[in-house]
Amino acid sequence: DARVVLERATELAKTDLTTGMVTEFTELQGVMGKEYALLDGESPEVAEAIFEQYLPRFAGDVLPQTEAGKVLSIIDKIDNIVATFSRGLIPTGSQDPYALRRQTIGILNILLNSEWNISLRPIIVESMNLLNVPADKQDELLGQVEEFITLRLKNIFLDREVPHHVIDLLLSNNELSVADAEGLVKALLANRIDENVELVQ
């Protein structure tokens, strides 16, 4: 059962961070977690999800392939973003010491490739609650995190040469999921291609 795999992988997700191997070689986080899980008799599905939580690790890296790995990766990255923002450590200019932009793009690429029609807002809110963010600070923090994510999505669409006005129109709707935005962009681009073909003919 996918839920059972996810719950178990979540329980074991960070256990390898306490080991000497990962303390010495931080780039092995997740890699060693997977190996330790297998050695301890965990299922291959649980072990793979533990590894996949860190994917993608860099631009062009592979994305998580398992359902549990995708969910764990999204949850982990959202938690990192919310925790860092809650401490006032918001990336500015070229400064991004915690690689929050990369993590956000990773989240978006997972969603774009999975076509999951989900909203990130409940995950952000749950993360704020688990981090004990004061209630009177949550609305502001939610707005900051959502704006940060939206800007990354805008950049992804710009790289695909989606017109500015189309992106602004789509992303002005805060209730629109990443999958919804992607579907509308594809439809609009397909329509634009049809128009160009007609003009050529």
Where are these regions (language model features)?
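Amphipathic alpha-helical "coupling" segments that flank catalytic cores
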Residues: 1-201
